[in-house]
């Protein structure tokens, strides 16, 4: 115990009173969509394992093979110990997958956004003497906001997915000398809606802006062969994504021009000062890149499940917001109602996590349903039935 513990405990008690305290729940995984908790098996509707690859035998085999052949750890930063042939191979494959000149692997999605953006935005002051003008969607992921804050720039926030508002803001600042950056997501992780990437590309070209697109929840799921929404729009200036969701593994990437990636190698603190990913993790990424382009049937199945979930929830009176992807929020409102509903779902064998402020705006707490190609229609119907029963039992009206 430290002398500061009473301060922390008082703050924790306050979070608890407001139904905002977060706790870790021990679980064991039994395949991509089954977890065991407190002796019970639950159908998992909370994981981002969108293609069900986290337990795929090809990924397991490649992880074992590369670990046995190349070792367990990488030892240090790539700038200290060098870049392995496995790294070169995976980055080259990733660049081909994304249709870019180059790609760079990083440790996690959070680290990528938090570290890449400050390095990227620094180019404005270096080349123009003025800070970057950064236009960001109001509902961007916390890591994107953190990266902009770490860069010391003031974000110019546009209304969510409102390209008219974005163009108005861009036009207002045409006379300013700083380089322009548009920073947004292709799929928004809490609402499950999509950005108009083609429209963003048009505005970026019209106003001479650099388009940075977070594809964490689109990579593997959307676009031709799962290459993301940027592939439908003719590309963006820099695409970021993760391997920890649809690709079933761990790590993150950015993909863009050779000049941009080379700049990041020299200036991105999260790349320079981080130990490189282990060979086994690189093996998982390599195997996933073999599989993902071939999984059109799984992507179609996943889209059908999402349509079924939205229709079923709507028939029960629940709002699923603007969702058009595999992420389907069941919007409950108050945080305590979301927690009660999540516990009641668990009692019925369903794992649906309550998402509360500050992750989502106050008054929009929800059960975030994340669907997987490993689910089937019967599982979705069971979730809808459990949702109806749980809400009725606890008097939680849509």
Swiss-Prot record:
Catalytic activity: 6-carboxyhexanoyl-[ACP] + L-alanine + H(+) = (8S)-8-amino-7-oxononanoate + holo-[ACP] + CO2
Name of a matching Pfam family: Aminotran_1_2
Protein residues bound to pyridoxal 5'-phosphate: 109-110, 189, 214-217, 242-245
Domain of life: Bacteria
Record flagged with keyword Cell membrane: no
GO BP term, example: biotin biosynthetic process
Binding site for substrate: 22, 29, 141, 359
Similarity comment text for this entry: Belongs to the class-II pyridoxal-phosphate-dependent aminotransferase family. BioF subfamily.
The protein's name: 8-amino-7-oxononanoate synthase
Organism: Gluconacetobacter diazotrophicus (strain ATCC 49037 / DSM 5601 / CCUG 37298 / CIP 103539 / LMG 7603 / PAl5)
């Amino acid at each position: 115990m430290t002398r500061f513990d009473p301060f922390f405990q008082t703050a924790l008690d306050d979070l608890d009173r407001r139904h905002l305290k977060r706790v870790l729940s021990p679980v064991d995984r039994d395949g991509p969509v089954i977890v065991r908790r407190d002796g019970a098996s639950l159908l998992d509707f909370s994981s981002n394992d969108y293609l069900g690859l986290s337990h795929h035998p090809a990924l397991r085999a490649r992880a074992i093979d590369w670990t046995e052949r190349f070792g367990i750890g990488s030892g240090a930063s790539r700038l200290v110990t060098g870049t392995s042939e496995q790294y070169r191979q995976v980055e080259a494959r990733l660049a081909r997958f994304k249709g870019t000149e180059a790609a760079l692997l990083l440790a996690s999605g959070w680290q990528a956004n938090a570290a890449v953006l400050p390095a990227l935005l620094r180019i404005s002051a270096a080349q123009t003497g003025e800070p970057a003008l950064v236009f960001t969607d109001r509902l961007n992921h916390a890591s994107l906001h953190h990266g902009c804050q770490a860069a010391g720039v003031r974000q110019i926030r546009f209304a969510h997915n409102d390209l008219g508002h974005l163009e108005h803001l861009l036009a207002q600042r045409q006379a300013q000398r700083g380089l322009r950056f548009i920073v947004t997501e292709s799929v928004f992780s809490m609402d499950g809606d999509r950005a108009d990437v083609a429209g963003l590309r048009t505005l970026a070209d019209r106003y001479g802006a650099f388009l940075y697109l977070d594809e964490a929840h689109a990579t593997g799921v959307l676009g031709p062969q799962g290459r993301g929404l940027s592939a439908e729009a003719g590309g963006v200036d820099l695409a970021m994504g993760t391997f920890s969701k649809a690709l079933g593994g761990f790590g993150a990437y950015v993909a863009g021009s050779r000049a941009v990636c080379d700049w990041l190698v020299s200036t991105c603190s999260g790349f320079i000062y981080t130990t490189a990913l282990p060979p086994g993790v690189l093996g998982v990424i390599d195997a996933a890149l073999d599989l993902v382009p071939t999984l059109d049937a799984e992507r179609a199945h996943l889209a059908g499940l999402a349509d079924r979930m939205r229709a079923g929830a709507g028939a029960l009176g629940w709002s699923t917001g603007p969702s058009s992807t595999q992420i389907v929020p069941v919007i409950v409102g108050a945080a305590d109602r979301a927690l009660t509903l999540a516990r009641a779902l668990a009692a019925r064998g369903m794992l649906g996590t309550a998402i509360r402020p500050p992750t989502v705006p106050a008054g929009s707490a929800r059960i975030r349903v994340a669907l997987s190609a490993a689910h089937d229609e019967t599982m979705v119907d069971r979730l809808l039935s459990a949702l109806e029963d749980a809400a009725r039992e606890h008097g939680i009206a849509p």
